[in-house]
């Protein structure tokens, strides 16, 4: 029971599936790195490091940022026009939904499935 009686919300998590994205942006490592960096700013998160991994010469990409408040990631499957996005932040000063929405605006999917959750700590 997330956020129930006696719970303190310590983090907010939004993640989703993006369908019908243009293949070119999903293959563009430099563009995806820039998008993740900007998403960290939009979320008001402190960027600590960023990395990426390409799965073969024509394969998809994983781009991830470690932020002081947790993480942001994009995983792509260009051959399917598909990406997954994950934004998790701790602290009231951050806005993971704003970061998620920013990434969606840049990847321009035809369809988005978004899921929200909180991470709660229960007092004993």
Curated annotation (Swiss-Prot):
Enzyme class: lyase
One Gene Ontology term, aspect cellular component: cytosol
Keyword Lyase among UniProt keywords: yes
Active site positions, chain numbering: 70, 75, 90
GO molecular function: adenosylmethionine decarboxylase activity
Tree of life domain: Archaea
Disulphide-bridged cysteine pairs: none
Residues bearing the modification Pyruvic acid (Ser): 70
Annotated metabolic or biological route of this protein: Amine and polyamine biosynthesis; S-adenosylmethioninamine biosynthesis; S-adenosylmethioninamine from S-adenosyl-L-methionine: step 1/1
Cofactor: pyruvate
Name listed for the protein in its UniProt record: S-adenosylmethionine decarboxylase proenzyme
């Amino acid at each position: 029971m997330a956020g129930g009686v006696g719970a303190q919300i310590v983090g907010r998590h939004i993640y989703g599936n993006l369908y019908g994205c243009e293949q070119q942006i999903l293959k563009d490592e430099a563009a995806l790195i820039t998008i993740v960096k900007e998403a960290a700013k939009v979320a008001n998160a402190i960027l600590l490091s960023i990395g990426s991994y390409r799965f073969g010469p024509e394969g998809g990409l994983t781009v991830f940022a470690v932020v002081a408040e947790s993480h942001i990631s994009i995983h792509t499957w260009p051959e399917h026009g598909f990406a997954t996005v994950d934004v998790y932040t701790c602290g009231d000063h951050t806005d993971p939904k704003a970061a998620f929405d920013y990434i969606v605006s840049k990847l321009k999917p035809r369809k988005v499935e978004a899921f929200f959750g909180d991470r709660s700590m229960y007092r004993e």
